Amino acid sequence: TILMNDKKLNIKVIAPVLLSFFVMSFVDLVGIGVDRVSNDMDLSATLAQLIPSAAFLWFFLLSVPVGVLQSRLGKRFMLNAGMVVTAAGLLVPYLFYTFEMVLAGFALLGIGNTIVQVSANPLLVDVVPGNRAPSFLSFSQFVKAIGSMLGAPLALVFASRFGDWKLLFLVFGVVSILSVIWLGSVKIDEVVKQETRVSL
C-alpha cells in the first residue's frame, strides 16, 4: 500500500465508490425509454414528454435538501439510499409495465439519481489521497460515460435476443442492488465537516 497525503490508496474501498458512478448513469435510460414506451403504449407526444419530466425535475427540487440530510446522516448512507431508490425506479417499470408505473418508476429513478449525484463525489474525495482526488474524479466521469454508452446497445440486444428491451431495467436494477451491498460491506472513514450555525 502506498501512503500519500496521509491516506492510503485502497482500491478495495475506492472500487465500490467508483461503481456508484456507473449506477449514476442509469438515469440516461429515461432517454432510451421515451421512444420505446411511446411505441409500446401508443402515447401521444404530450404524454410522452411527461416521462423525462418525471425523472429530471427532481434534481432542482431535492439537491439542497439531500445535501443537508447528507451532512447529518453521512455520505455513504445517502449514497446507498440513492442507489436503493434507483434500483426501485428500475424494477417498478420492469415488473409493472403501465404508463402510470413507468412515470412512478422514472420519478424514483430521478430521485435516486439526484441523491447519488450529490453524495458520490464527496465520498470519492474522502476515500482517495488528496493529491489523487482530481484524477479519480476525472476517472469517475469515464466510468459514468461507460454506463451511459451501454444502455442503447444493451436494449437492442435484449430486444433482438430475448424479445424484451425492458430486461435492461432488470439488469441495471440488480447492478444497483449489488453496488449497495458492496459499498455497505467496506469500512469507510468519512471526513466530517464542522457546521457553523448562524442564528438571527
Sequence positions of predicted segments:
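Short hydrophobic/aromatic, small-residue-rich stretches within specific transmembrane helices
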Residues: 49-56
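MFS 12-TM fold signature
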Residues: 85-90, 109, 175-179
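Extracytoplasmic
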Residues: 12-45
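Residue-level signature of mid-helix packing/kink "hotspots" within the transmembrane helices
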Residues: 28, 56-64, 149
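Conserved MFS/SLC helix-loop-helix module at the cytosolic interface between two early adjacent transmembrane helices
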Residues: 61-100
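Cytoplasmic helix-loop-helix junction between adjacent transmembrane helices
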Residues: 105-142
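C-terminal membrane-cytosol helix-exit motif in multi-pass small-molecule transporters
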Residues: 168, 173-193
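A gly/Pro-rich, aromatic-decorated transmembrane alpha-helix motif that marks the paired
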Residues: 140-161
